[in-house]
Structure formats: C-alpha cells, structure tokens
Amino acid sequence: MRKIILIFVTIVLPCLLCARNDDKSTDMLLREIDGIIRNRQTYGAEKEARISDLKKLLSEATSDEQRYGFCGRLFDEYRAYNLDSSYVYAQRKQELASHLNKQDYLDDAAMNMAEVMGTTGMYKEALEQLGQIDKKTLSDYLYPYYYHLYRTIYGLMGDYAVTEKEKKEYYRMTDLYRDSLLQTNASDSLGHVLVMADKCTVHAQYDQAITMLTDFYRKPSLDDHSKAMITYTLSEAYRLKGDKKGQKHFLAL
C-alpha cells in the first residue's frame, strides 16, 4: 500500500496539478482522478519512455562522470516505481564513485542503497549502511538527505515496533533527526516546511500544520511535484485532525 501511495504522489498527482486545480470542487477533482486511473497505462508508458531515453544516454556516455550522472537520474526515475531497478542503479553509482574516487559520490550512492533498503522493510540493514558513512567528512549538500533517511527509517521502525519500549525509543530517535533536519534545511525551503508540518502533526497541532502548508502552496514558483508533496501532506494533516472532507479534497487536489 505504501508503494501505491508513493507512485500516486510522484506520477498521478503532478498530472492533475498541471491544470490549475486550486479552485475546483472535490467531486470534479475525483472525476479527473478516475480518468487518470483509467488511462494509467498512458502515464506508465510516458515514464518508461523517459527511462528508455536515459538508458540510451547512459550507453552513449563517454566518461564515468557522465555515467554517474545518468545513473543518478535513473535512480530518481525508478524510486517508488521499481525498487529492484533503483537498487541496481544505486550500486552502479557506487562502482562509478569508486572509480572516480569521490567521497561525496560514494556517500550519496550509499544513501541511495539505504533508501531502497528502508523502503523494502530492511530497516536494520539500512541503518548499517548509513552507519558506514563518516558524518564528519559528509558534504554539506548531503546532510538533509542523510538526516531525512534516519528520520524516515526510525519512524517506520516505530510504526512497526512490537513493544511499547521499542516504539518509544524509535520515535525518540525520529524526533532527534527531525530536529536535525529543521536545523539543516533553509527556513524558506519546501523541505523545512514539510518537516515542520510533520512535527506539528505529531504534536497534534493540526491547524498550525495546515496553515503553514497552505501558505507555502500559494507560492507561484512551485513546480508540480512540490505541489503534489504539499497537497498529500495536507491531506494527511486533515486525516489526523479527523476532517474527512478536507482529507478527501486535498488528496484529490
């Protein structure tokens, strides 16, 4: 189910957002979603076409630097779409990073592998993978990804923990890495707003989260993927608040 939601957020929602859905009724939006689902093969074909083009560019690349870049783009295309393939390209990134002898490339590839492990439920393996990264030498631009993975993995471990003691400890670690993310991301960035909204909902401050997300959504410079992330997070805030109408509307928006 988690994979289906991720695919919906990354593929289907951006298609709807292209048409300026801000003022449409929920029923109208849901009818559009029905149409999107009926034509899901079309959107899947578009995804596969992008992947095919990237694979062609990868095969024609003349340097390991170029190959690393194309493998990174293929990993991005495959994440939440085909986890086996995303792991393959994370491994290829790691091999190329070794040839290039670039530590930040090695760290990024290792985190890609940890991301796939965490998504497939291999939480301890993901933490072991992250534990091999030397935080002291980590490049500044990788810190948000690093903290995000720890926060996400510990959060999932908390969700599925058997004992209350384990659950409490995992959620404590989730809070620590959430706070680290808030300190790392720029205060006016999408990442900061999403993490802050997450923190608000955890502490039952639903209206504060909704206001924050709604204000950020109105920014004219947002791309469709960013809008999709915000509207999905808004739907979750409304769900936790117990507002089914709001949840339904923003899940459709």
Where are these regions (language model features)?
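A "functional boundary" signal
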Residues: 4-8, 15-253
